[in-house]
Structures are given as structure tokens and as C-alpha cells.
Amino acid sequence: MEVKGFIEIMRPHNCILAGIVGILGALVAYEGIPDIKTLTLIFWVVYFGCSGGNTANDYFDYEIDKINRPNRPLPRGAMSRRAALYYALLQYAIGSILAYFLNIRAFVFATIAYFLTFLYGWKLKPLPLVGNITVAALTAATPIYGAIGVGRIGLAGYLAICAFLVNVSREIMKDIEDIEGDKALGARTLPIIIGEKKAAIIAAIFGFLTVIASFLPVKVGIGLGYAPIIIVDIIIIKASIDVLRDPKAASKGQKLLKIATFVAVISFLAGALTKGV
């Protein structure tokens, strides 16, 4: 076993980002600064949900990763599959305990979200579009969790809508990117069933819907700090048009959408803190 494999399988950079998004969701909803204890708990509950889900996903994706990502910890033999499963369950348990110290709604929400991350890797991921929507919903749940942690939703609801739409687009692009490995293993992802071109059209539609949804907060008086959302919209439009022109651009497109998502969260935060300005 490799010690570094236990860190790598968590994908800590993604989990740290998710934890930060959870905190930002709390800040956006609170329209101010909650106490540090609450923000710390939100960060770690989101972190362990993300890391547990990533670990479980690698457990279930072992055969696919041997083709698509042979350098991942399990395919290269950094740890056994059984160890990965127990490790995922341990992370879920730690996150659930921490969630209990926030409030009962935060505990219930986290428990449901954790179960969905496990169910996704176990059963939902191979289902065309269903798997994509599940991942997008879990991503959108991150800022909402932060909002629940501070006891209010506020602008975090609009952030969740945008996060859901853009991540459906991104997940479809990722399926287009992985189409060869998925075909080799007999997977039935959306691009395999309806073709790369039609899948690209659906991905682009969700991208354009995100741009439209990004204007919703303006109606409720979000602050001037929200202005950088224009840059986000430009990035999303570019990624959507590129994949429409050539589905092979999906790899670059999904990375652009990941960047756009983070910039959007910052824009929502700045808008919430400058509300009324």
C-alpha cells in the first residue's frame, strides 16, 4: 500500500474547492460573516462528503479506470479495493458526525447527499443523463449546504440553480471526452447512445440555460459586485459554441466550465456582500 494513495484517492484539491464553495454558499446566504466554528464545520462536512464520494467512485470505477485512468491509485495497486471501500465509509462517518454539530437539518441533508454520492458510483453513473443530473444536483447542493448550515437560503438558491445547469453541461462534456474508454467497457453513457454530436447539443443547451439563469439574481437586487458574472457567461458561451462546432472540444470545454463555476461563486459572494449598493 502507498500512503500517498490514501491522500490522492480523495482528490484533495477538488475537496478543498468544494469545501470553499460550501463556505461561500454560507456567506452568500448570510450576506455577512457567520461565526468561524460554523464555517469550519461546513467546510469539513463538505470536504469529507466529496472525498468519500471520490473514494467510493474509484472503488466502483476500477475496471473503467484501468483503461481511462491507469495511474489512479486502485489500478496501479496503491491500495486494495476493499481498503478503498472501508476508507470511503470512514470519511462518510466523520463527515456525518461533524454535520450533527451544525444542526439537525444540516445532518439530514448531509446524510442524504452522502448516500447519493455512494449510490451514484454504485448504480446511477452508468444511466444515461440520470448520472449526469445526479452529479450536477450534488454539486448544486454544496452551496445550499452552506446556506442550511447558517439557517437561511437567500441568494445561495440562485447560485445552486446556476451550478446545477452548468454542471449538467460539464458532465455531458466529460462523457464525450471519455467515450472511447466507456465504449470498450460496454458503458451506456449519453454520447454512446445518441452520438457525440447530439450529446454536444444537449451540453450546449444546458450551458446557454446557465447564462440565462445567471440574470435571475439581478431581479432581487444583487449588488454591483456581481458584475464579474459577465466574464463567466462569456466563458460558458465559448465552451458551448466550441463543443457544438466540434465535440472533440469537450475536454477543453469541461475544464473551462470548471473555471467558470468557481468565478461564478466569487461573483455571487461579491454580489451578496454589496447588496443594496
Swiss-Prot record:
Keyword field contains Magnesium: yes
Cellular component aspect of the GO annotation: plasma membrane
TM spans (from-to): 16-36, 84-104, 107-127, 146-166, 200-220, 221-241, 257-277
InterPro entries: DGGGP_synth, Prenyltransferase_related, UbiA_prenyltransferase, UbiA_sf
Record membrane topology: Multi-pass membrane protein
Keyword Magnesium: yes
Reaction(s) catalysed (UniProt annotation): sn-3-O-(geranylgeranyl)glycerol 1-phosphate + (2E,6E,10E)-geranylgeranyl diphosphate = 2,3-bis-O-(geranylgeranyl)-sn-glycerol 1-phosphate + diphosphate
Enzyme Commission designation: 2.5.1.42
Compartment(s) of residence: Cell membrane
GO MF term list: geranylgeranylglycerol-phosphate geranylgeranyltransferase activity; magnesium ion binding
Family: Belongs to the UbiA prenyltransferase family. DGGGP synthase subfamily.
Protein name (database record): Digeranylgeranylglyceryl phosphate synthase
Species, as recorded: Pyrococcus furiosus (strain ATCC 43587 / DSM 3638 / JCM 8422 / Vc1)
